[in-house]
Amino acid sequence: MTETSTLTGANIRYLLTMRALDKENRGIRCVSIAAALGKSKPSVHNMMNTLAACGFVKKEAYGLATLTAEGQKTAHRYSHYYDAACRLLRPAFSDEDLQTAAYALIAALPEHALESLCPG
C-alpha cells in the first residue's frame, strides 16, 4: 500500500496561507491568519500548536508565528502541488469549490503522485 501525505487539507491550507502572507518569513500574527482564512483566533492558535509539533512552525513572542526551514520547504513544495491540482480540477469545479477540492486532493495523494502532476 502506498503511503499518502501525513498533512491534512487544513494543515496545507494554513502553511500556504502563512507563506503567502509572510513572504519574508519575519513572522505573522495569528489574528492575520484568522482574518485571511475566516477562522477564529482559537482555531488558528490550535493549528499553530499542531504545526509547531510537526516542526513546521515556530511560535514567537507576542503571538507571532514563523515557518521553520522545514515549514518553508514544505509550503514551497505544496504550493506547486496546489497549483497543479487547481489546473487539473478547474474544469470540473466552480470557483467556490475549487480550493476545497484542491486541498482535499493533495492531502489524499501520496507525494510521488503529486510530483507527477507538476510539470518540469
Predicted segment positions?
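Basic, amphipathic "hinge/linker" alpha-helix immediately C-terminal to the N-terminal HTH DNA-binding motif
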Residues: 63-81
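Key DNA-contact positions within bacterial/archaeal DNA-binding proteins
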Residues: 42-45
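Amphipathic alpha-helical dimerization/coiled-coil segments
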Residues: 83-120
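Short, hydrophobic-biased segments on the C-terminal half of alpha helices
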Residues: 48-49
